[in-house]
């Protein structure tokens, strides 16, 4: 649920060290219909998708006493919304190299804390009841993204590919820690499901093409080492079941297509292998299938041979899946996309989505297309791309043949709408998509190769934004008030509260829990070797504040030590 009381300035003040003064400018656009992120399976049309643009710049005073402003950091985030999924995609982030002008600059990473605060703000304000949210980004090292000429500044520190992947994992990790963990197993009992679905839960996923599982774990933040192996917070895998409603669809339908994304360029190249309409019409099995890549695992394996992911460079793809209360990772996405009768009868044709020219130059925003008036009320993690004409079948008549037996699906919610625009999540300046592009293009035309030019460019940018929205000044001044060395948004883990109706009463002739727990510590838990602190299930309902972060074990899970 959207937290309407969240303020971006207040959130950043909590994570910035005490006394640090910055000026932020957050501009955003109204949600507009856009190309869906996922290509629809043959015989289905794409789901209704809206895109909302957000751009944040952070400035400091060049002199100690209210000197001219100079931009030190910028980040662009695209928020895609469908009826049953919200995707927060980090498009671009860049610095100018002038952060050293901040007097008495602390040693902590201000850029990392600001990035974390901005993403946390968008996540909190865009959460919807019963709708899964995913933060998605790809980490690719590059000299400059947003500020032309900034690479010439000696104060700009450009991370290498490995350092950048680790940096983004550390940015996302505090957001992950705000939510409960989940069990890594899909074979969960009633007690596990009740505990995990009682609160919002989250899991992070990371894939680095060309790296095996052992190498990928080296990119995880340090906090991952202390996570329970039975309830991991970081996984080296792709969240297929959390993002896709039909895991049996062709691989091209299972990967989202973001602007200026290495995956998108590879997908478009593979689409050249699609069979022609005449060939596809005679074979249902070959519809929507590439000739070379036949599975999703093969797609990720081939990604490591792409020029952007090879030649000594690594690219990290990161997803943070946040499940609202009532959903867990094992609950698979579902879709109410209409299925066309004409195509369902056998004349399956494959449509290739139409994109703007995709090259190595950042595109900035998603492609806008016109959509039908009819709404499709369920979504994949992202959505589909091409639309087709023809009679539409009622979504309620669709069968569940596409569902996975091992992954229960989210029930369609016909009351949901793909359009979502929370007031609390809007920027200091709200623009139309056209005005937003004008403002971003104006910034990309400026120069930031030295301090004097950067000050002039910052002034021109701020005046341009104010003129577009017809205001004298746009922005907010923020003063940090975090006195601790750690980020203020890190929450201590809390003990899970078990529903008392699910707690099994201990028989009188059983030994006490404390004695059993002690023996279990000595002997070890089955399949794990060691056991940390154990408490009774009954005590967890009343003593949640005494021992935060402890593991709660049921009596039937603890083995009795054999007598010598």
From Swiss-Prot:
SMART domains for this protein: KAT11
Q: Where does acetyl-CoA bind?
A: 138, 157-159, 167
N6-acetyllysine-modified residues are 263
Q: Which domain of life is it from?
A: Eukaryota
Class of the enzyme per the UniProt entry, highest EC level: transferase
Major localization class: nucleus
> Single Gene Ontology BP term?
DNA damage response
Please note every region of biased composition (Polar residues).
394-417, 512-521
Question: What happens when the protein's gene is inactivated?
Answer: Severely decreases acetylation of 'Lys-56' and 'Lys-9' of histone H3. Increases mycelial branching. Severely decreases spore formation and abolishes sclerotia production. Decreases aflatoxin production. Increases sensitivity to sodium chloride (osmotic stress), hydrogen peroxide (oxidative stress), methyl methane sulfonate (genotoxic stress), and Congo Red (cell wall stress). Decreases cell population growth rate. Decreases virulence on maize seed.
A Pfam family annotated for this UniProt entry: HAT_KAT11
Q: Which residues form the active site?
A: 261
- PANTHER family membership: ALTERED INHERITANCE OF MITOCHONDRIA PROTEIN 6, HISTONE ACETYLTRANSFERASE RTT109
Protein name, as recorded: Histone acetyltransferase rtt109
Which organism is this protein's natural source? Aspergillus flavus
